[in-house]
UniProtKB/Swiss-Prot annotation:
Protein name: Chaperonin GroEL
Gene Ontology annotations for the cellular component aspect, listed alphabetically: cytoplasm
UniProt subcellular location: Cytoplasm
Family indicated by similarity: Belongs to the chaperonin (HSP60) family.
Keyword Isomerase part of the UniProt annotation: yes
Gene field: groEL
Phylogenetic classification of the source organism: Bacteria, Bacillati, Bacillota, Bacilli, Bacillales
Length: 542
């Protein structure tokens, strides 16, 4: 395949055209008066969204050089989304501003390497200043404000604040599509796993089709139970105590299942069997989690333990267990709190070490079940199109809130970036390094300009006034008033603002130092013709 090569000014200009096309499509969504973008989908209805990264990922340009520029900025949005979960539009706006200003200066004769050093120096100072003015998030109201600003909906803010309060920082909050119109919160207290009873005859409440066990013993094993004789000794001990029993095993089948169901129906004892959650090594780890949570032991041959010699002392206990056809929930397990804490720390250490996103997600789920809880936000809407858009906004709000809890908050609406302007401007440098610093200074103003522009106002006027206002005072584009941003609840997570600035400067510096761009030449003949597959001598067949 032959290649097209462009050098210096031609190369950078071609990439800038791509940067501008992508950034211009994304930046219309910024701020409280930002608009939506409609994305065509090959199947189903179009997607309407104001999520920067979703828009950026959809954009493919015909010209390969322009497309490379667009993809570089798309990477800024993706990386910011991966790290902070929000702020993708801000990152795109910052990247475009730095690239545009940088190319003007490089075209005018500035050395790109010196400019790059200036950009890096200015951004390092800006990030230090952002950390210095960051305020920790302390109340449920603050969490609600962050989520409301990100999603543009106060009700969503309250919902996410309540979810985070109920499950804690280690809890898992998932977002699902609801069948109805309302958006609601469903919180699962205790440990829940997705395995239900092995037989519907085990239910205690036939209206709700669930089995509720009060203060049960819990037998945990990784073995299949086929023969009732294996568990008879421990069953007899539990019956003597007069308490119900939950059996968690790889499977309970055949004669063992039949005997348990028969005795349950006769009222001899109350027992429910469920399959162990997970598979392979993950199953072993989850069974150990359940054992630690309930103060029991996993009956496994790995530890030299057998079912027929198991005693009541090796069983776990809990205040209550609820089993449905799909799920088992263990509420208030009787495990030792120091052992649970040690297990939580062990899982945290594994999360830090793993390189797999899937493994990290599964470890986070295990951590939540041990330490926090699980909350499900069920998103409702009138149409499928609205549902998708609403779900994306709530996901952004959730990520934004987590970032705020992690690193604190700064004044929102682009105010924080302008408030650190003077500290960055005070940096001493000369020549091309100074040019790099000035490029960053210009870009720090850009989010405020764009928010004002989207609200139908002149950005430059707002920026100039903002520079002379007291620290923390900013422009509320939603109603056109000048207010103390943090007091008014207009806040951004520090992590989101920091990540946007870091990722934008990284890609801008790389693009400015580009001297040649190589792309595949378009194939002018189009795709090769498909050979005729007709079979000779069979022309008469229709």
């Amino acid at each position: 395949m032959a290649k097209d090569i462009k050098f210096s000014e031609d190369a950078r200009r071609a990439m800038l055209r791509g940067v501008d096309q992508l950034a211009n499509a994304v930046k219309v969504t910024l701020g409280p008066k930002g608009r939506n973008v409609v994305l065509e989908k090959k199947f189903g209805s179009p997607l309407i969204t104001n999520d920067g990264v979703t828009i950026a990922k959809e954009i493919e340009l015909e010209d390969p050089f322009e497309n490379m520029g667009a993809k570089l900025v798309s990477e800024v949005a993706s990386k910011t989304n991966d790290v902070a979960g929000d702020g993708t539009t801000t990152a795109t706006v910052l990247a475009q501003a730095m690239i545009q200003e940088g190319l003007k200066n490089v075209t005018a004769g500035a050395n790109p390497v010196g400019v790059r050093r200036g950009i890096e120096k200015a951004v390092a100072t800006a990030i230090e200043e952002l950390k210095a003015i960051s305020k920790p998030i302390e109340s449920k109201e603050s969490i609600a404000q962050v989520a409301a600003i990100s999603s543009g909906d106060e009700e969503v803010g309250k919902l996410i604040a309540e979810a985070m309060e109920r499950v804690g920082n280690d809890g898992v909050i998932t977002i699902e599509e609801s069948k109805g119109f309302a958006t609601e919160l469903d919180v699962v207290e205790g440990m829940q796993f997705d395995r239900g009873y092995t037989s519907p005859y085990m239910v205690t409440d036939s209206d709700k089709m669930e089995a509720v066990l009060e203060k049960p013993y819990i037998l945990i094993t990784d073995k299949k139970i086929n023969n009732i004789q294996e568990i008879l000794p421990v069953l007899e001990q539990v019956v003597q105590q007069g308490r119900p029993m939950l059996i968690i095993a790889e499977d309970v089948e055949g004669e063992a299942q039949a005997t348990l169901v028969l005795n349950k129906l006769r009222g001899t004892f109350n027992v429910v069997a469920v399959k162990a959650p997970g598979f392979g090594d993950r199953r072993k780890a989850m069974l150990e989690d359940i054992a630690i949570l309930t103060g029991g032991q996993v009956i496994t041959e790995d530890l030299g333990l057998e079912l027929k010699t198991a005693t009541v002392d090796q069983l776990g206990t809990a205040n209550k267990v609820v089993v449905t056809k799909d799920d088992t929930t263990i509420v208030e397990g009787a495990g030792d709190s120091t052992q649970i804490s040690a297990r939580v720390n062990q899982i945290r250490a594994q999360m830090e070490e793993t390189t797999s996103e899937f493994d990290r997600e599964k470890l986070q789920e295990r951590l939540a079940k041990l330490a926090g809880g699980v909350a499900v936000v069920k998103v409702g809407a009138a149409t499928e199109t609205e549902l998708k858009e609403r779900k994306l906004r709530i996901e952004d709000a959730l990520n934004s809130t987590r970032a705020a809890v992690e690193e604190g908050i700064v004044a929102g609406g682009g105010t924080a970036l302008v408030s650190i302007y003077n500290k960055v401007a005070a940096l001493e440098a000369e020549g091309d390094v100074e040019t790099g610093i000035n490029i960053v200074l210009r870009s720090l103003e850009e989010p405020v300009r764009q928010i004002a522009h989207n609200a139908g106002l002149e950005g430059s006027v707002i920026v100039e006034r903002l520079k002379h206002e007291a620290v923390g005072v900013g422009f509320n584009a939603a109603n056109g008033e000048w207010v103390n941003m943090i007091d008014a609840g207009i806040v951004d997570p520090t992590k989101v603002t920091r990540s946007a600035l870091q990722n934008a400067s990284s890609v801008a510096a790389l693009l400015l130092t580009t001297e040649a761009v190589v792309a595949d030449q378009p194939d002018e003949n189009g795709p090769a013709a498909v050979p005729d597959m007709g079979m000779g001598g069979m022309g008469g067949m229709m």
